[in-house]
């Protein structure tokens, strides 16, 4: 990232992308913010619109080092929203910040259906309007915001997975940071049970078992002698290489479908030797591929 934000007199410069998400109540603004949060954006929902420039200023580059950028969610609940929104945009532009404005909407009938399903009140119903009139009035009031939007998302026929794919394709790599898919590698022992959260499970009980070598039994798949034993045959090394090739082929396909988290469980009998060695081999490769990857040896001390 660039140097930290400075005062206006110094010529403030934002070193990170700034996005503003607004739109019709019930159209999916909160869902959009959740997707951006999963993509490692710093998200703030319900921010008073007049505070947007100050928020951008105080969140300097160092504070946002682990994030892709800022996403601010704003809606009509605030009095004089449209007027203050226009003033906030003008202030941001004076600061040299050109935020990307996303407007989220849906067709009237779909919004009516969603409110009937959730049974939540529309913000404008507190002004004495019925739901249908409140939706129409909100659309009218927010017309200037929609007109100023860089992108308008109509979520009428969008599932959450559709929405995630659209946002992911466009904004997941603005800063060239880690890929959006988070991979959790879990080694485990079948004698203790398969991890319930696993999306993919691989059974490695066909590999050479160090347990039957009394000198290796106290060690684990974290130790070099065990790794050399497990992958000491041509067939074991071929499996390891093909397994890793398979995973590096498969993970981008999950990523392209909008998945943001996947748990890969790798098991052997006790969860101490073969599964640990293979999980560590996969970890080494995935870390070089810029995935956000974690590893857990669940039964290492039990096996």
From Swiss-Prot:
Report the GO molecular function annotations. Answer: ATP binding; GTP binding
- Under what name is this protein listed? Nucleotide-binding protein DVU_1631
HAMAP family attached to this UniProt entry: RapZ_like (MF_00636)
Q: Decide whether keyword ATP-binding is in the record.
A: yes
Q: What does this protein do?
A: Displays ATPase and GTPase activities.
- Residues that, per the record, bind ATP: 23-30
UniProt source species = Nitratidesulfovibrio vulgaris (strain ATCC 29579 / DSM 644 / CCUG 34227 / NCIMB 8303 / VKM B-1760 / Hildenborough)
Q: Which Pfam families does the protein's record reference?
A: PapZ_C, RapZ-like_N
- For GTP, which residues are the binding ones? 75-78
Q: Does the keyword Cytoplasm apply?
A: no
Annotated family: Belongs to the RapZ-like family.
């Amino acid at each position: 990232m660039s140097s930290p934000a400075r005062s206006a007199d110094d010529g403030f410069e934002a070193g990170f992308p700034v996005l503003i998400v607004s739109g019709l109540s019930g159209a999916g603004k909160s869902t959009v913010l959740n997707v951006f949060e999963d993509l490692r954006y710093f998200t703030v929902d319900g921010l008073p619109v007049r505070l947007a420039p100050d928020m951008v200023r105080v969140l300097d580059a160092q504070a946002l080092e682990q994030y892709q950028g800022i996403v601010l969610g704003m809606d009509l609940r605030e009095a004089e929203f449209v007027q203050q929104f226009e003033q906030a945009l003008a202030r941001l532009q004076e600061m040299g910040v050109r935020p990307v404005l996303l407007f989220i909407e849906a067709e009237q009938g779909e919004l009516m259906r969603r409110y009937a399903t959730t049974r939540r009140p529309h913000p404008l119903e507190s002004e004495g309007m019925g739901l249908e009139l409140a939706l129409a009035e909100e659309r009218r009031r927010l017309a200037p915001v929609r007109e100023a939007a860089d992108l308008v998302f109509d979520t009428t026929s969008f599932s959450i997975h559709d929405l995630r794919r659209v946002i992911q394709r466009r904004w997941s790599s603005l800063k060239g940071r880690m890929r959006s898919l988070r991979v959790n590698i879990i080694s485990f022992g079948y004698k203790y049970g398969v991890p319930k959260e696993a999306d993919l499970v691989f059974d490695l009980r066909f590999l050479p078992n160090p347990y039957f070598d009394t000198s290796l039994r106290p060690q684990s798949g974290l130790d070099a002698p065990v790794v050399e034993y497990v992958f000491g045959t041509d067939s074991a090394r071929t499996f390891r290489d093909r397994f890793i090739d398979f995973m590096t082929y498969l993970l981008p396909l999950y990523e392209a479908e909008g998945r943001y988290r996947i748990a890969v469980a790798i098991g052997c009998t006790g969860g101490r030797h073969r599964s640990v060695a293979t999980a560590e081999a996969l970890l080494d490769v995935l870390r070089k591929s810029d995935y956000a990857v974690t590893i857990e040896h669940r039964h290492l001390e039990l096996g």
